[in-house]
UniProtKB/Swiss-Prot annotation:
Domain of life: Bacteria
Keywords: Chaperone, Cytoplasm, Nickel insertion
Record gene name: ureF
Pfam families (UniProt xref): UreF (PF01730)
GO molecular function: nickel cation binding
Oligomer status and interactors: UreD, UreF and UreG form a complex that acts as a GTP-hydrolysis-dependent molecular chaperone, activating the urease apoprotein by helping to assemble the nickel containing metallocenter of UreC. The UreE protein probably delivers the nickel.
Organism of provenance: Burkholderia cenocepacia (strain ATCC BAA-245 / DSM 16553 / LMG 16656 / NCTC 13227 / J2315 / CF5610) (Burkholderia cepacia (strain J2315))
Protein family membership: Belongs to the UreF family.
Record flagged with keyword Cytoplasm: yes
Subcellular location: Cytoplasm
Principal location listed in the UniProt entry: cytoplasm
UniProt-listed InterPro entries: UreF (IPR002639), UreF_sf (IPR038277)
Name of the featured protein: Urease accessory protein UreF
Length: 226
């Protein structure tokens, strides 16, 4: 990995990236309301399960394949699979989340003129655009490798989930850092699994997440948008 690639991926994984990730918990807040999360240990287990049972089977391999499609300018497959991913979201909240964050990242890519004009035109034509599709575009624009791209995406997801747990449980900063350290190995395993997943085996089936997310839409007290 070059220094340029590393810095670009650190930028994309940064919580300072202005795409609104901090405002979503992806069901974690609903899991807390359902008493599935009670403390640091149960928060760590919840986040680990989301990484290994959900992201590793769906979002991460989808991201890898979208990255390859951007790199080969396979615009037909890009559009078709982007639409499939948006349709696969289990609730209205989760769909709005990927659409809003995807749109925000796509606007950032266009404003910073990442990628050539032809690819930027393809990016602009994808509406709504899922976050992994936009993230794959940004990674392709910086010539990032698939394994590094997936690791950056997964780490950003773990960090955001941990941040949500710190606010909602609540947890202390040290407890949050322990969660992140504990999941480093799981991130590596999730990336390796995702890279070995063929396109027809990408699976976003997550019934518990879908149910909790739907419940969150009418939850009485909420900090987060999902």
């Amino acid at each position: 990995m070059t220094t340029t690639e590393l810095v670009a991926l650190l930028h994309l994984a940064s919580p300072a990236l202005p795409i609104g990730a901090y405002s979503y918990s992806q069901g974690l807040e609903a899991a807390l309301d359902a008493n599935l999360i009670r403390d640091a240990d149960s928060a760590r287990d919840w986040i680990a399960s989301g990484l290994t049972d959900v992201l590793a089977h769906g979002e991460l391999p989808f991201l890898a394949h979208q990255l390859a499609r951007w790199q080969t300018d396979d615009t037909h497959a890009l559009a078709a699979e982007n639409a499939w991913f948006v349709a696969s979201r289990e609730s209205a909240e989760l769909r709005r989340e990927t659409e809003q964050m995807g749109w925000s990242l796509a606007q950032l890519c266009a404003s910073l003129e990442w990628g050539d004009a032809a690819r930027r035109a393809t990016l602009a034509s994808l509406s709504p655009i899922a976050l992994p599709t936009a993230f794959a575009y940004a990674a392709a624009a910086h010539d990032a490798s698939a394994d590094a791209t997936l690791a950056a995406y997964a780490f950003g997801w773990v960090e955001n989930q941990t941040s949500a747990a710190l606010k909602a449980v609540p947890l202390g900063q040290l407890a949050g850092q322990r969660i992140i350290v504990a999941l480093r190995g799981a991130i590596d395993a999730a990336v390796r699994r995702a890279l070995a997943t063929p396109p027809d085996a990408v699976n976003t089936f997550a019934p518990q997440l879908g149910i909790l997310s739907a419940r969150h839409e009418t939850q009485y007290s909420r900090l987060f948008r999902s």
